[in-house]
Design a protein with these regions (language model features):
Chain A
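Sec-dependent signal peptide recognition
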Residues: 2-8
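Bacterial N-terminal signal peptides
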Residues: 8-16
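Electron-transfer interface patches adjacent to heme c in soluble/periplasmic c-type cytochromes
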Residues: 21-73, 84-146, 153-157, 162-163, ...
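Eukaryote-skewed repeat-based solenoidal scaffolds used as protein-protein interaction platforms
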Residues: 148, 173-174
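A mid-sequence, solvent-exposed acidic-amphipathic segment
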Residues: 174-184
Length: 276, 156, 103
């Protein structure tokens, strides 16, 4: 039996090597080409605006509101959290690569030692634990949400730069990819049903945002006040297709974020923004 | 039931008195402002009462007022609205949402060089007209734009 | 610290003043999602702005100005260096005020 599995595994590697076209980069190019072919008028950089890129009326409201965002106070609160030292006197900036600046586009990152994907939120919690603090729950908007609404702005302008360059990383990427393309929930939708195949179409009053660009602008403030992180948005999407959601920070959600973030490679980060 | 009706009648009566007073020039707009919050107008539950409460009954439609508001609101809780009045000596810009529980939203008195321009963000409860009223040189003008409000949203 | 942020700059002959005020702007019609009780009305009902000591804007508001209100107005005849003061008062009698210099 063991031999058989080993044989299958080696076959997989050989097969993987032959089917080189199924690399993460070719997956991304397929997605980008599909969208560019369907919407030749939309510039690649405008995918950061999501559904707004398809609707000038909506985009002009976004521009008006972003001129003086109503949620600046929350971001200031996040800044205070970021700057307040841990009980041992150390800070997030001291604990993170490059002082926490211009790094969010490298995350999620596959950690070879841990054998799993580490998100920017996980990196924050690693800092907390290393400095003797309790980790935050990734789904708690009052702590992790508020903190990242500021911490992610420190990487504004950096281009998304996700790497998938080891067998373990490919496995996590494929896991996320499977979740993205697989239909599930009572309504039998895949993420791809709305955010790739039907991206840019209207679903009743909603324009569906394309997967390319979805990972670069979270957290969002819906209606100008309701703070939502990317994985909290996954929870919302899962509920909409009537699928029991994971807790933000689950391996499955982290792998999905890894795949989705790779799909946004090359786009500039811009946190935290208004959404409807 | 009866009580409610009585209160509405009372409210309407008070607003009518204000309107008559304003119409007769007994109250100068500036004085109204330095004084109390225009409770009757702000708590009015229909457009006619609200318009009467701000002394804008019979306002003339004007193409010199531009109401810049979206066709479809992204989110009814924050709808950007810009009002530009090209009418000389614009003294007041007033914003109403005809389908809101209380239609009157804001009354801006402008003076000492302030342009006939206001930009803000308002709440809209339902699809309907966003109306601007402009007071200038003792006259009252108005213009409106319909804004559709939908519920839900993906927030992506 | 004031909860009002002001950006004021000259644009041609006009001063463009933008401000954001921290305020929940409760209409009094909204129900608390958990308790089902109406949230009492709590909104800014009076806003004034002065430029170089002269009142340029004197406004009355209802509860339907969005939470954390945004306001922009333009003033002719103002100049770089003039002081802008923006103040508000709400239906509970709370007050706030802030100033800035036109850039």
């Amino acid at each position: 039996m063991k031999k058989f599995i080993l044989a299958l595994a080696s076959l997989g590697i050989v097969f993987g090597a032959i089917a080189a076209h199924a690399s993460p980069e070719s997956d991304r190019m397929k997605v980008v080409n599909f969208l560019e072919h369907k919407y030749p008028d939309i510039k690649f950089d405008d995918y950061v605006y999501g559904a707004l890129a398809f609707d000038p009326d909506a985009k002009s409201q976004y521009d008006s509101i972003m001129d003086f965002p109503p949620f600046l106070d929350v971001i200031d609160q996040g800044k205070k959290m970021w700057e307040t030292p841990f009980k041992n006197g150390k800070t997030y900036a001291e604990c993170m690569p490059n002082g926490g600046k211009m790094i969010a586009g490298n995350y999620p990152m596959y950690d070879e030692k841990l054998g799993k994907v580490v998100t920017f939120e996980d990196l924050i919690n690693q800092c907390r634990v290393k400095n003797g603090e309790q980790p935050y729950s990734n789904g708690d908007m009052k702590t992790m949400g508020v903190l990242t609404s500021y911490a992610r702005t420190l990487s504004d302008g950096m281009k998304m730069n996700i790497k998938v360059d080891s067998p373990g990383a490919v496995k996590a990427f494929d896991n996320g990819k499977n979740l993205f393309y697989k239909r599930h929930g009572q309504l039998n939708f895949a993420c791809a049903s709305c955010h790739l195949e039907a991206a840019g179409n209207r679903l009743r009053s909603e324009i569906l945002s394309p997967v390319v660009g979805q990972a670069v602008h979270f957290p969002v403030f819906r209606g100008g006040s309701n703070l939502v992180t990317l994985q909290e948005r996954f929870v919302g999407c899962f509920k909409m297709i009537r699928q029991v959601p994971d807790q933000p920070g689950s391996t499955r959600f982290n792998d999905l974020e890894y795949f989705m973030s790779y799909m946004s490679n090359g786009l500039p980060l811009h946190a935290s923004v208004f959404r409807k | 039931m009866n009580n409610e009706r009585r209160q509405i009648l009372k409210g309407a009566g008070a607003a009518a008195v204000v309107a008559v007073a304003a119409g007769a020039g007994l109250l100068k707009p500036g004085n109204v402002f330095a004084a109390d919050w225009n409770k009757a107008a702000f708590e009015a539950k229909d457009v006619a009462t609200a318009m009467a409460g701000i002394g804008a009954t019979g306002a003339a439609e004007s193409d010199q007022i531009v109401v810049d508001a979206p066709n479809i609101a992204e989110n009814g809780s924050r709808v950007p609205v810009k009002v530009t009045s090209k009418i000389a000596n614009t003294e007041h810009i007033i914003i109403l949402a005809e389908k809101n529980t209380n239609p009157l939203i804001a009354d801006f008195a402008l003076s000492n060089g302030a342009d006939g321009f206001i930009s803000t963000a308002i709440k809209l409860g339902a699809t309907g007209n966003v109306r601007a009223v402009v007071k200038a040189g003792g006259k009252v003008y108005t213009a409106a734009k319909e804004v559709k409000v939908t519920i839900g949203g993906c927030g992506g | 610290m004031s909860g009002i942020r002001i950006k004021a700059a000259m644009s041609g002959d006009n001063a463009v003043v933008k401000c954001l005020m921290q305020h929940p702007m409760e209409t009094g019609f909204r129900k608390d999602a958990k308790t089902g009780q109406l949230i009492p009305a709590h909104f800014i009902n009076h806003v004034t702005a002065t430029v170089a000591g002269k009142t340029v804007l004197d406004a009355q508001w209802g509860g339907a100005i969005s939470a954390n209100p945004f306001l922009e107005f333009r003033v002719a005849g103002a100049k770089s260096g003039d002081q802008v003061v923006i103040s508000w008062e709400d239906n509970k009698g709370e007050k706030d005020s802030a100033d800035a210099t036109i850039a």
